[in-house]
Amino acid sequence: MTTYATDSQGKFIPSTQRPDGTWRKPRRVRDGYVPQEEVPLYESKGKLFAQKPLLPPGMSPEMAQKSREKREREQRIKQQREADANRRPPQNPVPGLLILNGDSKINQPQQRAAKSAKPKKKAVELPDVLLEQKQKEEQKQVRQQQQQQKSQKDHKNTKPHHQERIEEVAKAMNGLQLTNNHVASASAADALQTDLSKKLRKLRKKIREIEIIEERLRSTDGGPRPDKDQIDKAKRKPEILKEIEELEKGIAK
């Protein structure tokens, strides 16, 4: 355990001598610092519970042993009384008549009468119940057959009407499909005309740019000369004029 000394500035660890004879410097201790070896070890709840005494405070092991033996003895006596009560012979049906535990001949007629009485009651009630269930099932089957026959007749009567409705719907769908095809073809033609017009405008714009380049080539006022890309663009003038002519024919159609 670390020993501390105290001065006017607080606690500190005094200097100690090493095994080689040299001395360590004294070290100042911060307030509230606890060395690692003095930190209490963590113990789980199970370990703490196991360390607690099993007996109540002030109770000796001998007293606990006597109390446990007394409780076990009382429990055995209680079980013995219950077993004796279960083995107790039945009450005498006739006053003055003694019935022993091993003699069961006297009780046999009564037991046979009780056993035979119960099945007779069931034999009387069971057929009636089965008969009622069978009648209910037959009535249910008859009702189901009648409902099936009625539904089949209704289906036969309504079949022509449904057929007419189906044919009307099919005709309407065919007419709608033709209308949609016509609208689609018209919209496609309009889109094609729009694309041709846009392309024609772009080509005409290129022709105007080429004409400007040609004017710069013909001019002698000493202005800036066209570069190589502009000259190559001017050489494509015949091709562009041919494309414009073809597009104009396509738009005219």
Curated annotation (Swiss-Prot):
<protein>
    <recommendedName>
        <fullName>Partner of Y14 and mago</fullName>
    </recommendedName>
</protein>
<dbReference type="InterPro" id="IPR039333">
    <property type="entry name" value="PYM1"/>
</dbReference>
<dbReference type="InterPro" id="IPR015362">
    <property type="entry name" value="WIBG_mago-bd"/>
</dbReference>
<dbReference type="GO" id="GO:1903259">
    <property type="term" value="P:exon-exon junction complex disassembly"/>
</dbReference>
<dbReference type="Pfam" id="PF09282">
    <property type="entry name" value="Mago-bind"/>
</dbReference>
<feature type="region of interest" description="Disordered">
    <location>
        <begin position="218"/>
        <end position="237"/>
    </location>
</feature>
<keyword id="KW-0175">Coiled coil</keyword>
<dbReference type="GO" id="GO:0003723">
    <property type="term" value="F:RNA binding"/>
</dbReference>
<dbReference type="GO" id="GO:0000184">
    <property type="term" value="P:nuclear-transcribed mRNA catabolic process, nonsense-mediated decay"/>
</dbReference>
<dbReference type="InterPro" id="IPR036348">
    <property type="entry name" value="WIBG_N_sf"/>
</dbReference>
<feature type="compositionally biased region" description="Polar residues">
    <location>
        <begin position="1"/>
        <end position="19"/>
    </location>
</feature>
<keyword id="KW-0539">Nucleus</keyword>
<feature type="coiled-coil region">
    <location>
        <begin position="189"/>
        <end position="221"/>
    </location>
</feature>
<dbReference type="GO" id="GO:0035145">
    <property type="term" value="C:exon-exon junction complex"/>
</dbReference>
<keyword id="KW-0963">Cytoplasm</keyword>
<comment type="function">
    <text>Regulator of the exon junction complex (EJC), a multiprotein complex that associates immediately upstream of the exon-exon junction on mRNAs and serves as a positional landmarks for the intron exon structure of genes and directs post-transcriptional processes in the cytoplasm such as mRNA export, nonsense-mediated mRNA decay (NMD) or translation.</text>
</comment>
<feature type="compositionally biased region" description="Basic and acidic residues">
    <location>
        <begin position="65"/>
        <end position="87"/>
    </location>
</feature>
<feature type="compositionally biased region" description="Basic and acidic residues">
    <location>
        <begin position="151"/>
        <end position="168"/>
    </location>
</feature>
<comment type="similarity">
    <text>Belongs to the pym family.</text>
</comment>
<feature type="region of interest" description="Disordered">
    <location>
        <begin position="1"/>
        <end position="168"/>
    </location>
</feature>
<feature type="coiled-coil region">
    <location>
        <begin position="129"/>
        <end position="156"/>
    </location>
</feature>
<feature type="compositionally biased region" description="Basic and acidic residues">
    <location>
        <begin position="131"/>
        <end position="141"/>
    </location>
</feature>
<dbReference type="GO" id="GO:0005737">
    <property type="term" value="C:cytoplasm"/>
</dbReference>
<comment type="subunit">
    <text>Interacts (via N-terminus) with mago and tsu/Y14; the interaction is direct.</text>
</comment>
